[in-house]
Every structure is written in structure tokens, then in C-alpha cells.
Amino acid sequence: MLSQKNSSITSVLERTKNTTLNDQQLAELAIELARELLIASSHEMKLSERYYLWKMNRMMDDTLGKAFTLAMADKVFRPISHTRSADQFRFLLDEYGVPSYLPLHEKIAMRIGAAASILVPQIVMPVVTSKMRSESSDVILPSEDNQLKPHLLKRRKSNTRMNINQLGEAILGEEEAGRRLQQVIDRLESPECEYVSVKISSIYSQVNLVAYDQTLEEIKERLRLLYRSAKKHQFTHQDGKKSPKFVNLDMEEYRDLYLTCDVFKEVLSEEEFMQMRAGIVLQAYLPDAFEVQKDLTEWAKNRDSNGGAGIKIRIVKGANLAMESVEASIHDWPQATYYNKLDVDANYKRMIEYGCLPEHAEVVNIGVASHNLFEVSYALLLRAKHGVDEYVEFEMLEGMANHQARALQKAAGGLLRYAPVVKKEDFHSAISYLVRRLDENTSEENFLHDLFGMKPGCPLWDKQKKMFLDSCAKKDTVQSTPNRIQNRETEEHVVDYLSAFENAVDTDWSLRHNQNWALKHVRDFDEKEIPIIPLVINSETFTTETLGTSRDPSRN
């Protein structure tokens, strides 16, 4: 049965190769292919995965259970004190009740644990934490070598590549940033490691967009260290060939978008790194992302024409929507992201389509990062249509819908898994990642939310199919200009004395023209001649020829 399904998938892809299918035909074929992938995924499913899907499907219909699970991940596992953790555990049970989606034996264990935590929290809470760590061990891997290395070797034998992202404490100072940088370098030195992801905010703690140029130079120096390590400690492939290890620059906040791109381009334009192949992530939920993709593509083509190596862009939809919404609200800015999922999905398709064009893909390889089988199918067909199979790679999160990942790997001829890793003592630092994944997977419009109970032709399938077709229809017209356009250089302030009070909007330092505006004022002040300030005593003004020298403490 499974070989028949693989044959069906191959047949659909073969029908697409070197054709001139229009958008409508491509969308219809993508739906057919997604159906075949979903069926193939179900045949790939192991017993343990069926149990997990059964549990997750029940959670989708348990509103209080979802809220309890999110709150528990956020509140119970952070405190160092077992007594404090136990208090939070019991409080959440009183607030939400035992989740109804849990099987009976887990409900009983939770009640017993809550009662026992009153008397012996130092015994109960480590057990609860251990259970949580165990259940999330497929999603967040242990970074200790004796546990991580066997897993990497296992994945390698199954022709699965691994992209490692080191999680840890929040980077609040340069000491912690230095430790994180060294952790990534240590990982690159490991023979089993082929590919790492790192954010600029995890290797430099003092990102200051007002001091843009100084920040840029600091981050460039640290990125050079990573690239040098990647070049020095080459990865040995299964066929015996060696290549530099791959460093991927991750994205997080909108404010980091242009800074990350500038760091990436400037370092890779240096003679030392012209032959370095490296990657960067773009988030499709940002309207700016498509224009940034085009800019990176033109830069990469120029670099290639000057003898440089190609690059890779990993295209994701974005996982920090809640944070972007909160920041916009606090500062009274427009939200940096699109305001609805339809536009996000449309932009994602537009970016994949642009990236799959042969004249682009050869120099700028594409990483299609998605668990949405409709999106994956669309990209598979575009890849086949343009004959760019070797330049377009598919990526999924480690531990998420593994049966689906195996089916895709067979269809695509390979797979890259994004794998966060964390030390046992730093597990609490991975909670934010877990909460984001839980929030994302339980969001009503998310594909994984519906996957847990989806079959071809069911209402959940029809819902996701409609969303896919709607976004296909909009991909060529969706907005590609940024939402945040504040410009302190050109704006005019109009005061309306008859209107109600409205606070001034904070300056958005992520915008280059606002950075230049601030820099101009600083330079103007530097060149300004400070007048002599007289003493005023009893309404009389006193001046003197005697002058003193003082030091401005803000200038070292």
C-alpha cells in the first residue's frame, strides 16, 4: 500500500515537470498531491504517534485543557523553588481543573501528585518536571554529547540532515553572549554537526539600533568567528566528501530584520568569505520580506558573478506574532506583520514562487520550512515545474508530526530538521520555545491544529483547502510594502487644541531614516559651540574671564 502511495506522489510530480501549468492548474494539482501526502503520512504512523495524535486531537476540543497546558508550561517549570512550583501547580488545577483530554491514568496521577506536593514538593516537582522534559524530548533535544550524538547519527543514517539551534538563558550581558557564542563554536567543532542556526541577539547582548553602525561592526566580528570555525571544521558526508559546515542566521523580531541582512551581506562580501556558502531566514508574515528577498537575490547574483559562492534563504511564516502585536501596542506603532493569515499565506507562496525560478534558485537556494501539506505540495510542484530539485530543500521541526516528515522525505528525496537543543540545567530556558509551539499548534487557523483529526474530504480538510485556494488567488496582489513607515525626517506636527489628548508615538528605531535623523542631531550638537553661561545672583548677571575645563561623562 505504501509503495502505491509513493508511486501516486511520483506520478503527480512527473506530470508537472517542464510544463507551463498556470496558477489554477498548479493549485489543483497541489491539492491532489497534498491528499496523497496525507494518506502516505497515515501509513507511516507508528503506534506511539497514533497515541500522541489521539491525545492532541482531544486537546483541540478541550479549551480549558489547552489553557492549563500552556499555563503549566509557562508557570510551573520556571521557578527554582520546588515549593513555589508546587503552589503554581495546585493553583492551576484549582483554576482550570484536570484537563479532560488526558487519559484516565494521567488524570489520577495528576491528582495524586497535587495532593502529595503539599507535603513533599521536593520529591513531587522533580518528577513532574522530568515528565514534562520526557514528553518534550522529541521536540527539544538534550545538548549533552552522550545523548545528542547518537540521535544525530541515527538521523544521518536515515538520510535526514539536522539544523541545530542552541537554546539557553536570555542574553542580558556580554558574559552570557560570549558563552553562547562559544557554545555554537563548540558545536561546529563536533564532527557530527553539519548545520547550525543562530540569532544575532544570542551572540551580542547590546544591540542598539540608534548606534546602528557600531552594533553592525560588533556583530560582524562575532559572525566572522562562526564562519571561520565552520570553514575550519569541515563536515564529512556519507560519500566521504567534505564541505564547510553551514551557518544559518535566524530571525526573531522585526527590529532585527535589516540589521541581520546587512551583517549577512557585508561579512559574506569580504574576500575571506567570498567562497563561504551560508544562509539566512526570512519571515513571510512581514510584508517587507518579499522585497528583502529580491534585494538579497540581486546581491547574491552580483556576488556570484564576482566569483563568490551561493547562499540559501530559509522561508518561514514566522513564529513571534504575539510578541510583535504586544510591541506595536505598547509603542503605538502599526503592527509589523500582516493582520490576517490569508495575507501571510499569500506572501509565503509568492516568495516560494520567486525563489523557485531557475535564474534565482541556482544562486539563492531555498529552504521551504512548513508542516502545511498544501504549502509543501505547492513547493514540490514548483520545484518540479522549473527543474530546480537540487536547489530547493524541505524543512520541518524536529519531533513535530514525524510521520508526516517521513512521508515528505520520501517524496522530496531528503529532509532537513530544525532541532532546538538545551542542556538539562537550562531546560527552563526552553519553556518559551515550548509555549510558542503549543500556541502555534493550537491556533484555530494553523494546519497542525487541524492535522490531528484530518482526513481527505472531512470538514477540517475542506477548511484548509479553502484557505489554500484563497491565498493562491491573492499571492500576486498581496501587500509588499512595510506597515511601519514612520519618518522623523519628514513628518510635520500639527497641534489641534480642540481635540482630546493623545500621547506622542514612540520613535521607531528599527527604521533607517529615524536612525539617521537621530545621528544628525547628535552630530549637530557635537559641532555646536556652547555659549558661556553667566552666574545670576540677586537678579545681577556676573561673567568672568576665568574659564574651566570639564569632561562630558557620556564620551568616555
Predicted regions and their residues:
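Glycine-rich loop-to-alpha-helix module at the N-terminal edge of alpha/beta enzyme cores
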Residues: 535-556
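Glycine-rich phosphate/pyrophosphate-binding loop
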Residues: 485-540
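Positively charged, amphipathic and often flexible ligand-engagement surfaces
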Residues: 2-500
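Hydrophobic transmembrane signal anchors and adjacent membrane-proximal interface regions, especially
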Residues: 263, 381, 519, 542-547
